């Protein structure tokens, strides 16, 4: 008998790697130093709070009091007074009846969508929904309808044509790839008429829209009995973690039903303490919200983006992924770090630079951004 040919069960990865390289879709990691040496137009630290001394002090104080880790799931040993205090404070800030913390925004989206849908339900999702919402749809066991971007009529048609008793519509408030706002009032009206729950991911709306309270608050939907919000603590609040905010019945249900809550270690106390302190800064310094949008306007003007930014995100579509990578690399070589989004994050043919404004940018930094972006984009021909 011939000896078996030794082939690694991971040999197929070589072919996948070659395909990614050929398509210009290979990704790599580039560690950042503790003290920034480049102008940051790529991070989600919209309000500049990740380095705020009060936020750092809040994290350190929680670390010293509660220890490094939560030590278990929230249902075992991972719950503290700090967790529950911050849940109440965050819910109060955005106008919700209650809140529930998760270990990340990704986990919060999985917990909310899967826990509030399930087999025998319909889930209607925007085509530009974040990967966490896409995965939540896949795990929900519900029938899923994906509608064109920000298309209220398509959502209406999906709800009107359903046989399922329960229906859930999910959307981001501010879409992470293009910075566009969801038509929340119109979506809510459609949901109300067709007895559907509206789940809104406020990851990029919290701290930026509604005076900081988010687009749900701005749309007049805060506290609505048929609206549930999810958010992250890692963007405007400069920390880490996630939350689901909405009616008290939703919180009670997810404690019993959300697997990403039940079977996951609780959020580290330091992250909670930092996020709580960041919320305090946001309340005390509302000027940061207006500064984000002003600075986004400057970046959009430099990049000749036609639409006035409605969020911290400025999207500069370049089309070809290799062109987008080259532009991002040129910016970095000139001392400016920008985001570079390629498929599958965005649709084919829409690779782009994704710039994010921060409240803490000063005039000198904006001038550097103006010079570098102008030169790089002009060099693309």
Curated annotation (Swiss-Prot):
Pathway stated in the Swiss-Prot or TrEMBL entry: Cofactor biosynthesis; biotin biosynthesis
Protein's UniProt keywords contain Acyltransferase: yes
GO molecular function list: 8-amino-7-oxononanoate synthase activity; pyridoxal phosphate binding
InterPro entries per UniProt: Aminotrans_II_pyridoxalP_BS, Aminotransferase_I/II_large, AON_synthase_class-II, PyrdxlP-dep_Trfase, PyrdxlP-dep_Trfase_major, PyrdxlP-dep_Trfase_small
UniProt entry tagged with the keyword ATP-binding: no
EC numbers, comma separated: 2.3.1.47
Biological process (GO), any one: biotin biosynthetic process
Modified residue annotations for N6-(pyridoxal phosphate)lysine: 235
Needed co-factor(s): pyridoxal 5'-phosphate
Keywords: Acyltransferase, Biotin biosynthesis, Pyridoxal phosphate, Transferase
Binding site for substrate: 27, 130, 345
Catalytic activity: 6-carboxyhexanoyl-[ACP] + L-alanine + H(+) = (8S)-8-amino-7-oxononanoate + holo-[ACP] + CO2
Record: residues binding pyridoxal 5'-phosphate: 105-106, 176, 201-204, 232-235
Biological role: Catalyzes the decarboxylative condensation of pimeloyl-[acyl-carrier protein] and L-alanine to produce 8-amino-7-oxononanoate (AON), [acyl-carrier protein], and carbon dioxide.
Similarity comment: Belongs to the class-II pyridoxal-phosphate-dependent aminotransferase family. BioF subfamily.
Complexes and interactors: Homodimer.
UniProt-recorded name of the protein: 8-amino-7-oxononanoate synthase
UniProt source species: Mycobacterium avium (strain 104)
Lineage of producing organism: Bacteria, Bacillati, Actinomycetota, Actinomycetes, Mycobacteriales
């Amino acid at each position: 008998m011939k000896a078996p040919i030794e082939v690694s069960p991971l040999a197929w990865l070589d072919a996948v790697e070659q395909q990614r390289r050929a398509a210009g879709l290979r990704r790599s990691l580039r560690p950042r130093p503790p003290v920034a040496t480049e102008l940051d137009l790529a991070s989600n630290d919209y309000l500049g709070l990740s380095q705020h001394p009060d936020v750092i002090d809040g994290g350190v104080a929680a670390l010293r009091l509660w220890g490094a880790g939560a030590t278990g799931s929230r249902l075992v040993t991972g719950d503290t007074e700090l967790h529950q205090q911050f849940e109440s404070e965050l819910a109060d800030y955005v106008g919700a009846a209650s809140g529930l913390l998760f270990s990340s925004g990704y986990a919060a989206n999985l917990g909310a969508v899967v826990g509030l849908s399930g087999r025998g339900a319909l889930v209607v999702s925007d085509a530009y929904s974040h990967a966490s919402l896409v995965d939540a749809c896949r795990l929900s066991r519900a029938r899923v309808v994906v509608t064109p971007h920000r298309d209220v009529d398509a959502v209406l048609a999906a709800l009107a044509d359903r046989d399922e008793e329960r229906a859930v519509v999910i959307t981001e408030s501010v879409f992470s790839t293009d910075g566009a706002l969801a038509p929340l009032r119109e979506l809510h009206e459609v949901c109300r008429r067709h007895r559907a729950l509206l789940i809104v991911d406020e990851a990029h709306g919290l701290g930026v829209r509604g005076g900081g309270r988010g687009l749900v608050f701005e749309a007049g939907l805060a506290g609505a009995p048929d609206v549930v919000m999810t958010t992250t603590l890692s963007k405007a609040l400069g920390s880490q973690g996630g939350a689901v905010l909405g009616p008290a019945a939703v919180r009670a249900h997810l404690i019993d039903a959300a697997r990403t809550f039940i079977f996951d270690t609780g959020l580290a106390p330091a992250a909670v303490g930092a996020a709580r302190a960041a919320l305090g800064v946001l309340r005390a310094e509302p000027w940061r919200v207006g500064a984000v949008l002003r600075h986004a306007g400057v970046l959009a003007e430099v990049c000749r983006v036609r639409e006035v930014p409605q969020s911290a995100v400025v999207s500069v579509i370049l089309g070809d992924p290799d062109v987008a990578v080259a532009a991002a690399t040129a910016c970095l070589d000139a001392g400016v770090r920008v985001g570079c989004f390629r498929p599958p994050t965005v649709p084919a043919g829409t690779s782009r630079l994704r710039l994010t404004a921060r409240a803490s940018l000063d005039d000198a930094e904006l001038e550097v951004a103006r010079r570098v972006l102008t030169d790089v984009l002009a060099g693309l021909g």
